[in-house]
Amino acid sequence: MLYQQISQNKRRTVILLFAFFVLLVVIGAAAGYLLADSYQLGAAFALIIGAIYAFSMIFQSTSLVMGMNKAKEITVNDAPDFFHIVEDMALVAQIPMPRVFIIDDPSLNAFATGSSPQNAAVAATTGLLKVMNREELEAVIGHEVSHIRNYDIRISTIAVALASAVTLISSIGGRMMWYSGGRRRDNDRNDNGFGAIMLIFSILSLILAPLAASLVQLAISRQREYLADASSVALTRNPEGMIRALQKLSNSQPMTHPVDDASAALYINEPRKKEKLSALFSTHPPIEDRIERLKHM
């Protein structure tokens, strides 16, 4: 059952990433049709913009991300238990030892970053280290190490980049169509019915694509959280430890320092004040759902 869940989550992520690329091509084609009467040119432009965004974000410095989140690098002498747990989990996962950081914050949280296992890092709050027992801390670190091993940071970064690219292209397309004085619209009024249909479809694509992109990006983030939970259990062989850790995380207070959207998606638990929004608009699945899945393993 455990490995079936892992495989299912991986398949869902592939499907969502494919949907993202389709969405990017559609928004590019719509903009190209409205502005240059060329689907191909618009789609190619959209893919280039998406690739530039993805590469620039993937290679963002690990130290920069840690600095933005007030994390300080430690050695084995600073927090030996925490350091050795990270070391043990990395060994079991068969990845290089990540750099280890601590965030001085009373909330219960942790995250991993790095575009590959070779330049990865793990951070945990002082609150987490104080409250979690060894089994629970192993489960949390197993979750973060699984993100590294599964290249989740890279996948999530690509999703954020593609969502940003879709929003940018939609904004550019909308502004240029407005400033062009409606030449495309005038042409389509004199065209056949198909041209009018394509005009409406293109305009709707520009309007709705950013929302759709955000929903897909958030869905990918949630799937990777489910996958990391299951992968942590595969590493520790202790689903109860993961369940107890999640139960404690559910009672955590928000982080005391501001956390930006990109960083928030990295944490094991939503680091900001939890708003009563639909699960569709959350970077993290409800902890109750995560626990329920673990109980059925």
From Swiss-Prot:
<dbReference type="InterPro" id="IPR022919">
    <property type="entry name" value="Pept_M48_protease_HtpX"/>
</dbReference>
<keyword id="KW-0645">Protease</keyword>
<keyword id="KW-0472">Membrane</keyword>
<dbReference type="GO" id="GO:0008270">
    <property type="term" value="F:zinc ion binding"/>
</dbReference>
<comment type="similarity">
    <text>Belongs to the peptidase M48B family.</text>
</comment>
<feature type="transmembrane region" description="Helical">
    <location>
        <begin position="39"/>
        <end position="59"/>
    </location>
</feature>
<feature type="binding site">
    <location>
        <position position="225"/>
    </location>
    <ligand>
        <name>Zn(2+)</name>
    </ligand>
</feature>
<keyword id="KW-1133">Transmembrane helix</keyword>
<feature type="transmembrane region" description="Helical">
    <location>
        <begin position="193"/>
        <end position="213"/>
    </location>
</feature>
<feature type="transmembrane region" description="Helical">
    <location>
        <begin position="14"/>
        <end position="34"/>
    </location>
</feature>
<dbReference type="GO" id="GO:0006508">
    <property type="term" value="P:proteolysis"/>
</dbReference>
<feature type="transmembrane region" description="Helical">
    <location>
        <begin position="158"/>
        <end position="178"/>
    </location>
</feature>
<protein>
    <recommendedName>
        <fullName>Protease HtpX homolog</fullName>
        <ecNumber>3.4.24.-</ecNumber>
    </recommendedName>
</protein>
<keyword id="KW-0862">Zinc</keyword>
<keyword id="KW-0479">Metal-binding</keyword>
<dbReference type="InterPro" id="IPR001915">
    <property type="entry name" value="Peptidase_M48"/>
</dbReference>
<keyword id="KW-0378">Hydrolase</keyword>
<dbReference type="Pfam" id="PF01435">
    <property type="entry name" value="Peptidase_M48"/>
</dbReference>
<keyword id="KW-0812">Transmembrane</keyword>
<dbReference type="GO" id="GO:0004222">
    <property type="term" value="F:metalloendopeptidase activity"/>
</dbReference>
<dbReference type="GO" id="GO:0005886">
    <property type="term" value="C:plasma membrane"/>
</dbReference>
<keyword id="KW-1003">Cell membrane</keyword>
<keyword id="KW-0482">Metalloprotease</keyword>
<feature type="binding site">
    <location>
        <position position="143"/>
    </location>
    <ligand>
        <name>Zn(2+)</name>
    </ligand>
</feature>
<feature type="binding site">
    <location>
        <position position="147"/>
    </location>
    <ligand>
        <name>Zn(2+)</name>
    </ligand>
</feature>
<dbReference type="InterPro" id="IPR050083">
    <property type="entry name" value="HtpX_protease"/>
</dbReference>
<feature type="active site">
    <location>
        <position position="144"/>
    </location>
</feature>
